[in-house]
């Protein structure tokens, strides 16, 4: 998982939803001594993008898994085991591989051509239905 700041000029911390996609803002920060500072060319590690709640497919970076309201930061997952929020889990099956398209979770089929867009927006394989609106997924 990745802990990162949000851009308050784009979103309030209250706009972020657990299990929802997050997107790149185009800004990168260096995390040092519990503080995010804009990254410079002298920074080589611990640089992380800030995130927003909406974006284009090529800005998709992960799924929000934790919200830190006090520090106006979130944690997002790019792989591993995590939960994804949907409007109705009955539309999905265990073992389905899913990706984000226009902010919605969609299912890959055996005939889906794996484009750069599909590869970059793949969320993972559904491992369980936690509730009517929450899926468990795994991505290696």
Question: How would you name each of these model-derived features?
Answer:
Residues 1-140:
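Extracellular receptor-binding modules and their adjoining Ser/Thr/Gly/Asp/Asn-rich linkers
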């Amino acid at each position: 998982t990745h802990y990162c700041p949000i851009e308050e000029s784009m979103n309030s911390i209250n706009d972020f939803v657990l299990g929802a996609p997050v997107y790149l803002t185009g800004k990168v920060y260096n995390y040092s001594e519990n503080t995010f500072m804009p990254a410079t060319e002298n920074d080589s590690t611990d640089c992380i993008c800030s995130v927003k709640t909406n974006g284009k497919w090529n800005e998709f970076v992960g799924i929000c898994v934790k919200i830190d309201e006090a520090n106006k930061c979130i944690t997002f997952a790019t792989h591993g085991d995590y939960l994804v929020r949907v409007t109705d889990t009955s539309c999905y099956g265990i073992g389905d591989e899913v990706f984000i398209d226009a902010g919605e979770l969609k299912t890959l089929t055996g005939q889906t051509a794996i484009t750069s867009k599909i590869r970059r927006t793949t969320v993972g394989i559904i491992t369980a239905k936690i509730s009517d609106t929450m899926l468990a997924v795994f991505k290696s």
